[in-house]
Amino acid sequence: MIEHIWRPETGITEIEGDWHALRASEVEGIRIVWGEQRERLKGSQQLTEFTERLSREWAIETGIIDNLYDIDRGVTQTLIEHRFQAEFLSHGSTNKPRDYVVRLLRDQKDALDGVFDFVSQRRELSTSYIKELHAALLRSQTHTDGIDPSDHGIQVPLIRSDWQVQPNSPTRNGKIYTYCPPEQVASEMDRLVEGHAAHMHNGVSAEVQAAWLHHRFTQIHPFQDGNGRVARALASLVLVQAGLFPLVVTRDDKVGYLDALEAADIGNLKPLVNLIAKLQRAQFRKATAISDEILGASTDVQQALAGLNRVAEQLLDPQTGKMASAFNHARILADQTRQRLARLRWDVQAALRRVSPLASVTVKLSEPQTDRPFQSHITENAYKWFGYFPNTDSYRDRVCLDMVWRRRAKFVFAFHGTGRPFNGSLVCVPFLEFSDTDETAQTRATLIPVADEAFLFFYSEAEDEVLTRFLDWRERVLVTALRELTANL
């Protein structure tokens, strides 16, 4: 079966409809808050190390996504933390020669470093730069997979930094994918660059720009090999240019990534935009840990005093600026959740009374005297579950569905700040807590997360956009929680 990714009757197409309908509102919040935090951390060793680790992660994962090599997870983390050295690649940790893998990793990291340089030099995207980027990414690759006239797989010499001269028709899942024919690649690439320039001029949001540029580039598939790596580098360029994080697509994201690209093939760019937003949230959560590291690592008195003054100034009037806006969002979301749980409680209670006739379900709100255990649970599990460090001093609230039958369980939505000092972002963390009494009358609590990620929102987001995102996320959480409750009756 043949799948035409690039269509000759249209070529690459513009963004369909109003781009505002595609945007992810939290990305602008990430841009603003990360920009403020990055400025505070400017010149710090922690910021430099974070950027280096991020670049190394990008370099490793972009090759894994393209099946250049495999590296096991433990070694991946070692390489991210300690640079690319062949001795870290023990026997069996990769499926390719160690020195070759290290060369590819260094090439890919150097290429991303080149993207950062491109942005800092305020250069404009051009076809010549895209060729330059391709040459950097594939510097150590000399051959690529091909097919001979007898339909046998062979290795063919790789052409770097120039457009393909033979049709590119890879096969996946029994389908043959066809892209732009070689004779039209140059004109289509000119159109791609012109389209990107128009988006920049018109202020199209970064996540939409990145999704469009990535997908339309892959539709053209201008190079003999390495198109996926170049596409992710171009998307990263757009995001970094906007003050965001590079596009780190990990092996765990691969299925969703390919599905999003296939949705874009049939005209729906939104899943790819949403994936980019999700990956930005993931990097932002990692970035919030830097401030905590600096607060703990500061040994200079003046630096410590400067940090103290910044926090004191921020806490001077909690009703103004970013704090007031963020806290107002949190109160609205908590109230919406209280109303939703109040409607849900009767159905849950009716179900539990099939098991225990005296079962009861009530909605409970945050109370100072009962908050401490929940704060402890959140502090202990936030990083393990969701990869961030909580700040319950800046803000905390919770809404809870308290269920008592033969067992006792609490379904909790906990709201609190992130970052130290508070950076204008808050999260909602949902979890189930089951409490059981053992034969010695000791109560054991078991906590179960009921979401893939915490809900992250920002002071700079519009109230209606935060609420729209939250309601969709919350309904998915409710489904997961009810399934867990069913499994633990």
Regions found by a protein language model. Give the residues of each.
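FIC/Doc superfamily catalytic core
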Residues: 1-224, 229-489
